[in-house]
Curated annotation (Swiss-Prot):
GO terms for molecular function: L-rhamnonate dehydratase activity; magnesium ion binding. Substrate binds at H33, R59, E349. Its EC number is 4.2.1.90. One of its GO terms (biological process) is amino acid catabolic process. This is L-rhamnonate dehydratase. HAMAP family: Rhamnon_dehydrat (MF_01288). Its cofactor is Mg(2+). NCBIfam families: PRK15440.1. Signal peptide: none annotated. The keyword Magnesium applies. The lineage of its organism: Bacteria, Pseudomonadati, Pseudomonadota, Gammaproteobacteria, Enterobacterales. Binds 1 Mg(2+) ion per subunit. The keyword Protein transport does not apply. Catalyzes the dehydration of L-rhamnonate to 2-keto-3-deoxy-L-rhamnonate (KDR).
Amino acid sequence: MENSMTLPKIKQVRAWFTGGATAEKGAGGGDYHDQGANHWIDDHIATPMSKYRDYEQSRQSFGINVLGTLIVEVEAENGQTGFAVSTAGEMGCFIVEKHLNRFIEGKCVSDIKLIHDQMLNATLYYSGSGGLVMNTISCVDLALWDLFGKVVGLPVYKLLGGAVRDEIQFYATGARPDLAKEMGFIGGKMPTHWGPHDGDAGIRKDAAMVADMREKCGEDFWLMLDCWMSQDVNYATKLAHACAPYNLKWIEECLPPQQYEGYRELKRNAPAGMMVTSGEHHGTLQSFRTLSETGIDIMQPDVGWCGGLTTLVEIAAIAKSRGQLVVPHGSSVYSHHAVITFTNTPFSEFLMTSPDCSTMRPQFDPILLNEPVPVNGRIHKSVLDKPGFGVELNRDCNLKRPYSH
C-alpha cells in the first residue's frame, strides 16, 4: 500500500473499443445490447422506433448496438493500472485520447473529483444532456476509482465509506421471471412488446403477459414492466391500470427522458400502490434533480452513462433527501460497490444476458474477468473485498486502440 502522502500521479490514459458498427457483431461486453442471434434482449421489444414497421421486430435493426464497448485504462507512475468499461465504442476512444487526456495525465490518483469537474465543464459545449459524451466521462471516472482503490489496496465501496448492509439482494431483468424466481431473485422485470401504435390491443397483450407470469410466479414475487421510452402518458396510464389486478410492482421508463411533466402526470394517475420509475437514460445531475421533483418513486441512473460513480453518489443524495429510492440500472460491479453503501437502495438490478434467461451469465461477459454473479439472488459484501472494483480486463477480447496521443 502506498503512503497516503506519496500517492502516485497518473502517467497515461488509454482507450480501446470492441464490437459496434466498425468491429465484430455480437461482442457483448460493456455494450450489452450487442448480442448474437436469438437473444431475448433483441426479440420484438417495444421502443420509440417500434411505430415504424421496418424497425419493430429487432432493436438491432435500428442500430441499438452500433456503439460497442469502450474500455478506458489509466496507468499510474508506479505501474499500477485501473480500468472500466461502458457503451461508447470508437467515438468514445477519440474523446478520451484527443480531449479528456489533458485533464487526467499528471494528476494525483486521488484527484477524482477535480478531474470529473474539469471533464464535465470542458465538454459542456458538445455534451448536451448526456449520451455518448457522458458515457465516455463515466467510463473515465470509473477507471479512476478502480485505479485509486488498487493503489491504496481497498475495494471501492470502502473508499465510499463502507457497506451499510451485509449483502445485496437482486431482482432479475429478462423475459422469464418464472426462471428468475427459481434462481432465488426477489422479482422479475419484463420488457413490454407493444406500444401506442398498437392501441388497446397492445395493452391487452402486455397485460396478458403479466397475468401469465403472475400465475406462474405466485402472489408475492415481484413483477415489473420495462417500457424503454416507448409510450405516451395516456397509453402508460391505461397499461398501468390494466396490470393493477396482477399486483404489478412498478412500471418503468414509459416516457422519453425529458418529458418531466408527463412523469408527474403518470405518477399522479397511476394505480394506488404501483410505483413509477425512470432514469437510466438521464445523463446529468441536473436532470435527476428535475426527475426527482416529478415525484416518481425510484430513480434508476446507469453509473456508466450518468457521469460515473462520482455523479451516482450525488444522485443518491438527491433521492435520499426526498425519501426516494435509487436503484441503478444494471452495471454489475460498478453499481455493486456503490449501492452497498447507499441507505436508500434496498435492492438492485441484475440484467440477464444469457440468451434464454436460463443460466447465470455475467452482465459484461466476456470483457471482465472474475465478474461476480448473484448466488440465490444475492451477493455478499465479502465478494467485493478486492482492490478497486475487483475485476480484471480480458485482454483476449479483440481490443482496438484507434487513437493515441
